Design a protein with these regions (language model features):
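Binuclear metal-ion centers of metallo-dependent hydrolases, dominated by the metallo-beta-lactamase
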Residues: 15-22, 107, 111-167
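Alpha-helix C-terminal capping segments
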Residues: 7-11, 62, 81-85, 141-148
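Core dinuclear metal-dependent hydrolase active-site scaffold
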Residues: 17-84, 155-167
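Metallo-beta-lactamase
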Residues: 58-107, 112-116, 120-129
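Active-site environment of divalent metal-dependent phosphoester hydrolases
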Residues: 2-7, 22-25, 39-41, 76-80, ...
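Active-site metal-binding motif and surrounding structural segment of the metallo-beta-lactamase
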Residues: 1-17, 85-91
Length: 167
């Protein structure tokens, strides 16, 4: 984002900022910035000296020769998250954090894209089950997600081969 670009430049690092909706290419992969709402700092006075805006955070939509992947980013649920073109796979955060989708919001996203593979993320990599951003339990998804066979529980570093959906 433009905000992250400013932080990089403050460190004298070469970078390019992008706005939500911008598209850029990395070789044969097209990348689009998707909206996110993760300005949690604004809810806690004194946490930061600046006011954060929604466009400071983002998700990423990757269009690859093998298919599309939506990396949602850390975000609260936004209406536009439910009306995007269907991806082939979603890096799927299903924790119960109010600054993420919440469990119920994550289920809404999963069921809005009933053919997208759900690559579970943002859980199990931090031993902190009492801390809501990391408290996801994959077993809870199977009874509430349409087409639960698309839920993919991968170990860290486990390969995943993306294939374009036949829909």
């Amino acid at each position: 984002t433009v905000y992250v670009d400013s932080l990089m430049k403050n460190l004298n690092l070469k970078s390019v900022g992008h706005n939500i909706g911008d598209n850029f290419k990395v070789k044969n992969i097209s990348v689009n910035l998707t909206p996110a709402d993760h300005a949690y700092q604004n809810a806690y006075p004194g946490m930061s000296k600046r006011w954060f805006k929604n466009e400071d955070a983002c998700g990423f939509w990757f269009d690859t020769p093998d298919g599309t992947i939506w990396a949602t980013g850390d975000s609260r649920l936004m209406p536009e998250h439910l009306t995007m073109k269907a991806p082939d796979a979603i890096l799927f955060d299903f924790s119960d954090s109010e600054w993420h989708f919440t469990f119920e919001g994550a289920v809404k996203i999963a069921n809005a894209y009933p053919d997208a593979l759900l690559l579970l993320c943002h859980w199990g990599s931090v031993d902190s089950p009492e801390f809501s951003p990391f408290n996801g339990d994959p077993k809870k998804l199977y009874d509430v997600v349409v087409n639960p066979e698309r839920i993919k529980v991968l170990a860290p570093g486990e390969p995943f081969v993306l294939q374009r959906s036949k829909r």
